[in-house]
Swiss-Prot record:
GO biological process terms held by the UniProt record: cell division; cell wall organization; peptidoglycan biosynthetic process; regulation of cell shape
The protein's name: UDP-N-acetylenolpyruvoylglucosamine reductase
Coiled-coil region: none
Source species taxonomy: Bacteria, Pseudomonadati, Pseudomonadota, Betaproteobacteria, Burkholderiales
Main function: Cell wall formation.
Protein's organism: Burkholderia orbicola (strain MC0-3)
NCBIfam families in the record: murB (TIGR00179), PRK00046.1 (NF000755), PRK13903.1 (NF010478)
GO cellular component, one term: cytosol
Domain FAD-binding PCMH-type, first and last residues per copy: 25-197
Main location (coarse class): cytoplasm
Family to which this protein belongs: Belongs to the MurB family.
Record bears the keyword Transferase: no
Cofactor(s), names only, from the UniProt record: FAD
InterPro entries, A to Z: FAD-bd_PCMH, FAD-bd_PCMH-like_sf, FAD-bd_PCMH_sub1, FAD-bd_PCMH_sub2, MurB, MurB_C, MurB_C_sf, Oxid_FAD_bind_N
C-alpha cells in the first residue's frame, strides 16, 4: 500500500473526548486533539504558534495508557498509514509500516503476503508506532528480534531521525523511548527484517497445547497455524477492550536475581518461574497476583479479570484513579507476601 501524499495542514479539535482513544475506555478530555496522517504534520508542529508552551502527547491505539485526569495540552492522534516492502535480499524481506497502522492488522498482512515471523505477536493491541516503545512481546518472542530501524520526528525541532536497534536500547518491555526519549519523539514508520528462513518459536506450553488441540504437531505447524493458535489463546484469556475496557497485561513479569529467587522458592516452592540466560529468573506476575487472592476482585468500578490476573478491567465508569488505586493495592499485597515489586506496564498520566 503506497504512503499517501504529504499534507502538513493541522486541524485542532478543541475540548476533545478521549474515551474512544484509550482501550480502558476512561473518560478524560484533551484541551486540543489533532489527527496526524503524515510525518510532515509532526515536523511542522514546532512552528505552530497555537501550540506554543502546550504539552504534547502522541497517542496511537491508546492500549498502554491510563488517564487519571484531563490532558491540558494537545493530544496528537497518530494515524499515519502505509505498508510496503522497502527492499528484499536473498535472506530477508524488509517491511515498513506507518506508525499509525494497527499492529495486529499489520502482522496479518505480513502473513497474507508470505512473510512470516511476527505471528507470536498476533492480537497484541496498539499500533506499529507504539510497538518499539514498549518492545512488545508474547509467547517467547519480543519485537526487537525482527526490528530493523525506525523513523521518528523530534517534536521540539521537527527534525526527522533514523534509529537502529542499538540506538533504541531495547529492554524487557522497555526502550530509549520510555526513558530518555519519553515524550520527545513521534514514531512515524518502523521497518522490520523478516528472514526468509522461517524459525518457529514454540517454547511456550500454551501454544503447543493449542496446536495439539487442533491436531497439529510442532514439526508440522505452519506460520498460519501458529498465528491462529496465538489468536485463539489470547481471545480465550484476554477480554475484548470493546466489551470490557482494559490495557492487556497491566504488570510486567518481574525479574529477580538467583539469591532472591532461592529465598522466594523456599517460601513458595510452586512459584511459576522462567530462568533467564543471564542467571536471573523471571516470575509469572499473574501467578503472584492470583496467589494473593486478587483474581476476580474489584475496587469500585475497576477489577481484576476473573480469567487472567494480569489484566485489570473497567467494569463501567471506572476512572483512572480507580485503576491506579487497584494497581497499588495489588502491588502492596505482592510486596508483603512475596517481597517482589510489580511494575506497571501502562503509562499513567
Amino acid at each position: 500500500m503506497p504512503m499517501p501524499p504529504d499534507d502538513s495542514a493541522l486541524s485542532l479539535l478543541p475540548d476533545h473526548p478521549l474515551a474512544a482513544h484509550n482501550t480502558f475506555g476512561i473518560a478524560a478530555r484533551a484541551r486540543f486533539a489533532a489527527r496526524i496522517t503524515q510525518a510532515a504534520q509532526f515536523e511542522a508542529l514546532h512552528r505552530d504558534p497555537r501550540l506554543a508552551n502546550l504539552p504534547q502527547l502522541v497517542l496511537g491505539g491508546g492500549s498502554n495508557i491510563v488517564f487519571t485526569r484531563d490532558f491540558d495540552g494537545v493530544v496528537l492522534l497518530d494515524e499515519i498509514a502505509g505498508r510496503r516492502v522497502v527492499r528484499e535480499d536473498d535472506d530477508a524481506w524488509y517491511v515498513e509500516a506507518g506508525g499509525g497502522e494497527n499492529w495486529h492488522a499489520f502482522v496479518a498482512w505480513t502473513l497474507e503476503h508470505g512473510m512470516p515471523g511476527l505471528e507470536n505477536l498476533a492480537l497484541i493491541p496498539g499500533t506499529v508506532g507504539a510497538a518499539p516503545i514498549q518492545n512488545i512481546g508474547a509467547y517467547g518472542l519480543e519485537m526487537k528480534a525482527y526490528f530493523d530501524s525506525l523513523v521518528a520526528v523530534e517534536l521540539a525541532t521537527g527534525r526527522r531521525e533514523r534509529f537502529d536497534a542499538a540506538r533504541c536500547a531495547f529492554g524487557y518491555r522497555d526502550s530509549f523511548f520510555k526513558r530518555e526519549g519519553r515524550g520527545r519523539f513521534a514514531i512515524v514508520a518502523v521497518t522490520f527484517r523478516l528472514p526468509k528462513q522461517w524459525m518457529p518459536r514454540l517454547g511456550y506450553a500454551d501454544v503447543t497445547r493449542e496446536l495439539d488441540a487442533r491436531g497439529i504437531t510442532p514439526e508440522a505447524a505452519t506460520p498460519r497455524d501458529v498465528f491462529d493458535a496465538v489468536v485463539a489463546i489470547r481471545r480465550a484469556k484476554l477480554p475484548d477492550p470493546l466489551v470490557l475496557g482494559n490495557a492487556g497485561s497491566f504488570f510486567k513479569n518481574p525479574v529477580i536475581d538467583a539469591a532472591q529467587f532461592d529465598a522466594l522458592r523456599a517460601r513458595a516452592p510452586e512459584v511459576v518461574s522462567y530462568p533467564q540466560p543471564d542467571g536471573q529468573v523471571k516470575l509469572a506476575a499473574g501467578w503472584l497476583i492470583d496467589r494473593c487472592g486478587w483474581k476476580g476482585r474489584a475496587l469500585g468500578a475497576a477489577a481484576v479479570h476473573d480469567r487472567q490476573a494480569l489484566v485489570l478491567v473497567n467494569r463501567g465508569g471506572a476512572t483512572g484513579a480507580d485503576v491506579l488505586a487497584l494497581a497499588r493495592a495489588i502491588q502492596a499485597d505482592v510486596r508483603a507476601q512475596f517481597g517482589v515489586e510489580l511494575e506497571a506496564e501502562p503509562v499513567c498520566l
